């Protein structure tokens, strides 16, 4: 299933497969998060990329930029994600989500109440939970892949 979704089988899944319960649980969680009814696939992939850029995980940066491209995110957006605040490629709602993703992807976490106040201007409570879920999922993957050297 993951191969058909991503176009390849990630090394992280190969290592997780050594613990079938972990692999099954992770796959269910990732499927739920990527199947959000409140966020479009472009935004999910941009949040994943921003969070991975912020954490410094090169493996996840490569895979999330590939995922964004496969989801149809414009090459211009992918190229300008580090300059999203000044770029006219991103909507105000995308900028609010990316503000949180870049801040929450840091260690220690740099998210603030102001991030959530701005998100409230653009998203429902359910969508905000889904934004945080994407960031948290990639927090796990960033640590997993950097630790195992995927």
Model-identified regions with their sequence ranges:
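Hydrophobic alpha-helical segments
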Residues: 1-150
């Amino acid at each position: 299933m993951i191969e058909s979704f991503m176009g390849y089988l990630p090394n992280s899944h190969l290592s997780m497969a050594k613990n079938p319960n972990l692999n099954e649980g992770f796959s269910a969680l990732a499927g739920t998060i990527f199947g959000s009814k409140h966020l479009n696939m472009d935004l999910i992939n941009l949040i994943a990329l921003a969070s991975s850029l912020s954490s410094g995980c090169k493996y996840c940066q490569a895979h999330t930029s590939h995922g964004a491209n496969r989801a149809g995110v414009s090459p211009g957006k992918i190229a300008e994600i580090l300059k999203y605040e000044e770029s006219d490629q991103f909507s105000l709602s995308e900028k609010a989500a990316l503000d949180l993703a870049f801040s929450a992807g840091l260690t220690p976490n740099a998210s603030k109440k102001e991030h959530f106040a701005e998100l409230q201007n653009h998203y429902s409570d359910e969508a905000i939970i889904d934004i945080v879920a994407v960031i948290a999922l990639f927090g796990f993957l960033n640590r997993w892949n950097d630790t195992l050297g995927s």
